[in-house]
Amino acid sequence: MSSAATVDPNEAFGLITKNLQEVLNPQIIKDVLEVQKRHLKLYWGTAPTGRPHCGYFVPMTKLADFLKAGCEVTVLLADLHAFLDNMKAPLEVVNYRAKYYELTIKAILRSINVPIEKLKFVVGSSYQLTPDYTMDIFRLSNIVSQNDAKRAGADVVKQVANPLLSGLIYPLMQALDEQFLDVDCQFGGVDQRKIFVLAEENLPSLGYKKRAHLMNPMVPGLAQGGKMSASDPNSKIDLLEEPKQVKKKINSAFCSPGNVEENGLLSFVQYVIAPIQELKFGTNHFEFFIDRPEKFGGPITYKSFEEMKLAFKEEKLSPPDLKIGVADAINELLEPIRQEFANNKEFQEASEKGYPVATPQKSKKAKKPKNKGTKYPGATKTNEIATKLEETKL
């Protein structure tokens, strides 16, 4: 892996900003690379809530670009954020989930041939409970209004009818993490934009420098509309999903003929398959094979994403055929991760204890007393019952 000393600043900047949807304050990055002539320090944070899904391949390909550009990359396992987000991760399981996320991220990166020796993992609670951090939370809460905090977390924190106060603390902590992790830049999905702006606008008021922000596009979910989400099982494909289940989910995914705008499958090819192929085989390499049945024209290989996208738009590539290719490609990506999980006891324990399967409680039906009539000894006479019922009437 190249270091900043051997990577040309322009080449490094190109790698850092490649395939991103938006960059805030790019001049900060250029100043570090061209003027200060040092490694760019950045972090990517993830809250260990639901099980990671295939959408995580998008930030993983960017971590690969950052490392190739010589960046010092920190992965923040934001355990307290997971707890604060409407208690998506209860405290008794959050430590196991953080470990599960760490092992999953390492497995993904290894599966796409990315060296991870220079990757640093930090658990949020290791510094977020210190006196200095706590005091800065108080200082920041004395600057940021309730409305600003709520708006900042609107696209990230789970929205409910009666929101908890924790949802307002969440974006303040994410802003402060930039200072306490000592970075020049924070990377995240475009859904984080409002939190990034909150950090830019308010950290200088505490005497801290403004950071740059990098945003990747969000991979659409399998259903129509919405993003792939760890907390919505119907929108995602789990990284440990069995091959048959992957095909079943892909076959039921929304995919309208000729529609290239609202197409989660094409987006997955564009933002996951294509970048991974470039990582493995070099720049501009693209080869997408579809094992199409002979009666529909036989197998076909596309040599560029644009060619494939145009074929779908012109309805030369049908939704069923696209689904065949995407399901096969996903299963090929997931196989080494499944294998690593199967051979790693620590990985399995983190999964078992982080995501315990609730055992349904069998409720015993209350036995109804049999009506034995009025003949058996001690039975209440029918006319006596009628009298008592009459007495209870208001």
From Swiss-Prot:
Motif Nuclear localization signal, chain ranges: 360-378
Native species: Saccharomyces cerevisiae (strain ATCC 204508 / S288c) (Baker's yeast)
Entries under InterPro entries matching the protein: aa-tRNA-synth_Ic (IPR002305), Rossmann-like_a/b/a_fold (IPR014729), Tyr-tRNA-ligase (IPR002307), Tyr-tRNA-ligase_arc/euk-type (IPR023617), Tyr-tRNA_synthase (IPR050489)
Principal cellular location given in the protein's record: cytoplasm
Keywords: Acetylation, Aminoacyl-tRNA synthetase, ATP-binding, Cytoplasm, Ligase, Nucleotide-binding, Nucleus, Phosphoprotein, Protein biosynthesis
Sites of Phosphothreonine modification: 359
Effect of gene knockout: Inviable.
GO terms for biological process, alphabetical: tyrosyl-tRNA aminoacylation
Extra remark beyond the main annotation: Present with 2710 molecules/cell in log phase SD medium.
Gene that this sequence comes from: TYS1
Organismal lineage: Eukaryota, Fungi, Dikarya, Ascomycota, Saccharomycotina
Name of this protein: Tyrosine--tRNA ligase, cytoplasmic
Function statement: Catalyzes the attachment of L-tyrosine to tRNA(Tyr) in a two-step reaction: L-tyrosine is first activated by ATP to form Tyr-AMP and then transferred to the acceptor end of tRNA(Tyr). The specificity determinants on tRNA(Tyr) are the base pair C1-G72, the discriminator residue A73, and the three anticodon bases G34, U35 and A36. Also involved in nuclear tRNA export. Also attaches D-Tyr to tRNA(Tyr), this reaction is about 150-fold less efficient than attachment of L-Tyr.
